[in-house]
Amino acid sequence: MYYVAGFNSRSDSFRFKQILDGNGIFCSIIETPFEINSACSLSIKFLASDLNAVRFIESRIKSSSFVGFFKVEENKFGRKITRIY
């Protein structure tokens, strides 16, 4: 299980990753899962243990292109994506 932060802007995705990196949060840029309706093809993947810190950082930034946070659960049958915020 991991979490994804979705944005409607590639530049905002890169900016958010830089901010998370600067705060010591391990994250990576991934292709946005098709289940997430976003105008941008890139999202930020991060660990479940960092969810509260990432939510706090996003609440301070308040990016206008922020789509939401999503929980991604994968198993041998596929994946389930749930919007959490």
Protein language model regions, located:
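C-terminal structural segments of small proteins and small subunits
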Residues: N52-Y85
